[in-house]
Amino acid sequence: MLDLKRIRNNSNEIKEALNNRGEKFDVTVIDEVLKLDEERRNILVKVEVLKSKRNQVSSEVPKLKKEGKDVSNIVAEMKNLSEEIKGFDATLAKIDEKIQYIMLRIPNIPNPQVPDGETDEDNIEIRNWLEPTKFDFEPKAHWDIGTNLNILDFQRAGKVTGSRFTFYKGLGARLERAVISYFLDTHTEKHGYIEILPPYMVNRTSMIGTGQLPKFEEDAFKISEDDYFLIPTAEVPVTNLYRDEVLKGDELPLKHVAYSACFRSEAGSAGRDTRGLVRQHQFNKVELVKFTKPEQSYDELEKLTNDAETVLKELGIPYRVVRICKGDLGFTAALKYDLEVWMPSYNRYVEISSCSNFEDFQARRANIRYKEDSKAKPQYVHTLNGSGVAIGRTVAAILENYQNEDGSVTIPEVLRPYMGGKEAIK
């Protein structure tokens, strides 16, 4: 959520920034929220005048009573003032509700570093690692490799649940588990993150806090009778871990890593990478989340991105890093990098991680602040997160980039200790 004071003082700048985003945004709501804000502030002035008058009148009552004078007119005046204040308070509550409704639907403002552009074709490659994998045979898609090795079963998952689910079987299940353990061990032991195992369901307030609601409710799986939501990413519960709290400045940056299953309806994604493991309704992911001071956040974003890159380098999977343009930035991020791995069957790079700085956008929604010391005024933290990285897509990338002509798949060296020393899946 944006700072209302920032909108008030820089409305034209805010409108221009919102106009530059890819998704068409009705900037007239900025004028609407400013009108409501002005109305609210005018009423607050009136309320303060009335309260001052009520206090003044009230202070006269004891003296007049002591003198034996009739105070019924004064008491009646106090009652009228209180009723008038009560009416204004009710009006303020309605105005606050309208302002909140609008503010929750205004996207974040892109950082000046974000390049211009309208679609993912306008994203800018920052760096890459390893050349795309070459084969002297026709490479297979990961869903065919997994099916042929009897380690992935999409057909039976379709029978049991529906499309875009899978069973991992045998060494496929072990490979998934190995990747999860390797990622968690790397981020906790080498990169200094504190591990969290979060709930897989959250309440509506949590989804609002990280920006999934109200805009993206159709993409979420909802437990209607309880108003709970299955988490689309561990970012939601981990960020909300500190909702409505004031952290200590010397604790920052706080770094958490969390493995979780993730659940997404992927509404509107029909036909886009819907075969195999790339775009499933349920998938596993290791998430990196940071809480920082504002002046630290962009340095910490670079570190977080490098942490996510490390596991791809050690796995030996070709990848690149792209800076996301304004039109592809999404609702909550101020600046975002995507890590994309090479997928031979697609003959292109596929996103495996998004690393974002939200600045104070989520912190304002979730009311997460910090104080430098006990006497300091609380300030909003900056929140960051990134996949460290998506598990199913990592398995897909391993199957495709490490496939052999005989149909087997070589296991990356860093995963072999987690696979009982096995060197290949045959």
Swiss-Prot record:
The keyword Metal-binding does not apply. It catalyses: tRNA(Ser) + L-serine + ATP = L-seryl-tRNA(Ser) + AMP + diphosphate + H(+); tRNA(Sec) + L-serine + ATP = L-seryl-tRNA(Sec) + AMP + diphosphate + H(+). It is found in: Cytoplasm. The keyword Nucleotide-binding applies. Keywords: Aminoacyl-tRNA synthetase, ATP-binding, Cytoplasm, Ligase, Nucleotide-binding, Protein biosynthesis. InterPro entries: aa-tRNA-synt_IIb, aa-tRNA-synth_II, aa-tRNA-synth_II/BPL/LPL, Ser-tRNA-ligase_type_1, Ser-tRNA-synth_1_N, SerRS_1_N_sf, SerRS_core, tRNA-bd_arm. L-serine binds at T233, A234, E235, E287, S387. Its EC number is 6.1.1.11. Its main location: cytoplasm. PROSITE patterns: AA_TRNA_LIGASE_II. Pathway: Aminoacyl-tRNA biosynthesis; selenocysteinyl-tRNA(Sec) biosynthesis; L-seryl-tRNA(Sec) from L-serine and tRNA(Sec): step 1/1. GO terms for molecular function: ATP binding; catalytic activity, acting on a protein; serine-tRNA ligase activity; transferase activity. Gene3D superfamilies: Bira Bifunctional Protein, Domain 2, Serine-tRNA synthetase, tRNA binding domain. GO terms for cellular component: cytoplasm. ATP binds at R264, S265, E266, E351, I352, S353, S354. GO terms for biological process: selenocysteine biosynthetic process; seryl-tRNA aminoacylation. HAMAP family: Ser_tRNA_synth_type1 (MF_00176). Belongs to the class-II aminoacyl-tRNA synthetase family. Type-1 seryl-tRNA synthetase subfamily. Homodimer. The tRNA molecule binds across the dimer. Catalyzes the attachment of serine to tRNA(Ser). Is also able to aminoacylate tRNA(Sec) with serine, to form the misacylated tRNA L-seryl-tRNA(Sec), which will be further converted into selenocysteinyl-tRNA(Sec). Consists of two distinct domains, a catalytic core and a N-terminal extension that is involved in tRNA binding. This is Serine--tRNA ligase. It comes from Clostridium botulinum (strain 657 / Type Ba4). The lineage of its organism: Bacteria, Bacillati, Bacillota, Clostridia, Eubacteriales.
